[in-house]
């Protein structure tokens, strides 16, 4: 069973426990286990079979037993027990942006509303006002959340879809006769959300591959099955499509089914001008002679272009850049040396000790990590005195670690509604990495949000603007913002913008990355880790940066520590963005 499916079940158990039993300890335990498993790079099923689940943080014997049931039978008795206590539509209400378990419990138990449709009717009729602490403003907010929820229906976050795809590919590669198996579609282009999963396999005999695909453990229903292709719906709710190709056509099919449609049209138009024809079967001349198709490189070479990375294939200038020899050398995860936004247990929502974070970073090959716990505006955040003590603790541990890795003393400081920072500037001035971010009043108009950020960036003590648009994929839209104005001030003040690699954020967006590059503003790619296991999430931020045409020279945390420290000093990032 795929890691993502196990994590989904554990998360659902946590939601149901909160609604039915209210045991906060058990709820937290299941939520943490779900998060750890969702982000674990290895196979959870394999760990179970090897008796090694206990090696994962937060996975005790009780939860390990539930995971074992899932791996062995595909079912979980605890989930079935709890699901019987709650109408199916109640769980869907929990997926609405800004509608938490306490609100859902009140809506369900006080008003007898059992699904999203009933909730919408109650908001429109005013009946929702009968529930405690739910007024007219809240009703309008819930209606907006319902509208956004429906607009996003049927799409899955990149990291979850990738987890399902990789698990399926691992099984398909074990089928005798399979020469190659790859993901295609928007998932290969690393779009932040995907509507389905496209898999391509190169094999001379398609039959065994199709049969293996339709019999995978995560399949809920077979939607279509033919000699060389099949479609299934996974238990996770997303559709997966398989096509089996002869090896000589695999590259052509991989290019075609990777897309985007706009990119494919642009490339076909170029081919026509050259007297060629491109299809999913290959590149052909006017006489029907096949010029290539076994690899994507052959496809591009036949039309006089170098290989274009999948992340760029959106018809946003990549073909013109390739023709002119100006394709960027996109940043890679191996280029990154550090992580400049990491939380420890010193503030409210961090779950790992400093030593755990250092060990995890060392294992991942990181050279430096900035510890940036929350300031006092967040629950249990640090005031100036506690921040100074925490910084001293970080520096003492850094001295003992002797550069394996280096720990930098920092903070994630709130930008208050006025634009002032949550801590005095003198408390921030001695820190090596100050990440400033908005966490409140997200519904303010663009002009107010922009001026709020501009004032914060102009303070002289901020190094990085964290998760610059505040979005959370699938649950919260970005707040309104005049990005051009923010970039102008960031360049002037020497502030970098963050590409937050948290899979639920991915903020800046790819479009924002291109805008930052054009404005001469560097970015940092950071995990915003709240647990040591999150440190492996950098790849998601790297993919956003690649979609945004960024190179290593555009990303500050590709720098050796000595140069990074120099660039983080006042004004250095803006000068350096063009100088590397």
How should each PLM-predicted stretch be described?
Residues 187, 413-415:
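Hydrophobic pocket-lining residues within nucleotide cofactor-binding pockets
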Residues 370, 411-412:
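Core AdoMet radical
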Residues 1-22:
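Charged, compositionally biased N-terminal leader segments and the immediate start
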């Amino acid at each position: 069973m795929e890691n993502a499916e196990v994590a989904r079940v554990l998360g659902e158990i946590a939601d149901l426990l909160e609604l039915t039993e209210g045991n906060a300890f058990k709820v937290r335990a299941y939520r943490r286990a779900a998060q750890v498993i969702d982000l674990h790079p290895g196979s959870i099923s394999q760990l179970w079979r090897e008796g090694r689940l206990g090696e994962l943080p937060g996975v005790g014997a009780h939860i390990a037993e539930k995971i074992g049931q899932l791996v062995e039978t595909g079912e979980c008795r605890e989930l079935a027990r709890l699901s019987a206590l709650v109408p199916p539509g109640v769980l869907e209400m929990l997926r609405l942006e800004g509608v938490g378990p306490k609100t859902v419990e009140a809506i369900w138990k006080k008003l007898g509303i059992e699904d999203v449709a009933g909730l919408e009717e109650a908001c429109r009729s005013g009946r929702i006002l009968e529930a405690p602490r739910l007024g007219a403003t809240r009703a309008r907010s819930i209606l907006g959340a319902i509208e956004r929820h429906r607009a996003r229906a049927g799409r899955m976050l990149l990291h979850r879809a990738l987890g399902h795809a990789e698990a399926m590919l691992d099984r398909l590669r074990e089928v005798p006769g399979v020469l190659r198996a790859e993901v295609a579609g928007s998932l290969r282009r690393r779009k932040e959300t995907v509507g389905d999963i496209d898999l391509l396999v190169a094999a001379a005999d398609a039959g065994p591959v199709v049969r293996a695909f339709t019999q995978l453990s995560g399949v809920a229903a077979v939607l279509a099955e033919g000699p060389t292709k099949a479609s299934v719906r996974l238990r996770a709710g997303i559709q997966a499509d398989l096509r089996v190709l002869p090896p000589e056509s695999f590259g052509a099919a991989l290019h075609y089914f990777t897309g985007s449609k706009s990119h494919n049209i642009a490339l076909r138009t170029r081919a026509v001008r050259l007297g060629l024809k491109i299809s999913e079967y290959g590149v052909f001349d006017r006489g029907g002679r096949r010029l290539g198709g076994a690899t994507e490189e052959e496809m591009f070479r036949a039309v006089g272009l170098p290989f274009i990375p999948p992340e760029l294939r959106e018809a946003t200038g990549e073909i013109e850049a390739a023709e002119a020899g100006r394709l960027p050398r996109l940043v890679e995860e191996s280029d990154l040396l550090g992580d400049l936004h990491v939380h420890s247990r010193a503030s409210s929502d961090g779950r790992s000790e400093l030593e755990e974070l250092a060990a995890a970073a060392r294992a991942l090959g990181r050279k430096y990590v900035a510890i940036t716990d929350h300031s006092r505006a967040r629950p249990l955040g640090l005031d100036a005195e506690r921040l100074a003590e925490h910084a001293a603790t970080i520096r003492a541990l850094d001295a003992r670690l002797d550069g394996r890795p280096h720990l930098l003393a920092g903070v994630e400081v709130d930008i208050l509604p006025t634009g002032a920072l949550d801590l005095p500037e003198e408390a921030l001035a001695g820190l090596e990495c100050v990440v400033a971010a908005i966490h409140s009043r997200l519904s303010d108009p663009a002009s107010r949000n922009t001026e709020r950020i501009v004032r914060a960036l102009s303070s002289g003590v901020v190094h990085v603007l964290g998760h610059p648009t505040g979005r959370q994929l699938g649950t919260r839209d970005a707040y309104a913002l005049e990005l051009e104005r923010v970039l102008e001030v960031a360049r002037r003040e020497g502030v970098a913008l963050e590409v937050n690699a948290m899979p639920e954020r991915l903020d800046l967006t790819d479009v924002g990355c291109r805008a930052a590059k054009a404005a001469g503003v560097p970015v940092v790619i950071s995990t915003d880790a709240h647990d040591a296991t999150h440190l492996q999430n950098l790849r998601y931020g790297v993919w956003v940066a690649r979609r945004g045409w960024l190179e290593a020279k555009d990303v500050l945390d590709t720098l050796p520590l000595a140069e990074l420290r120099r660039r983080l000093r006042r004004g250095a990032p803006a000068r350096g963005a063009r100088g590397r």
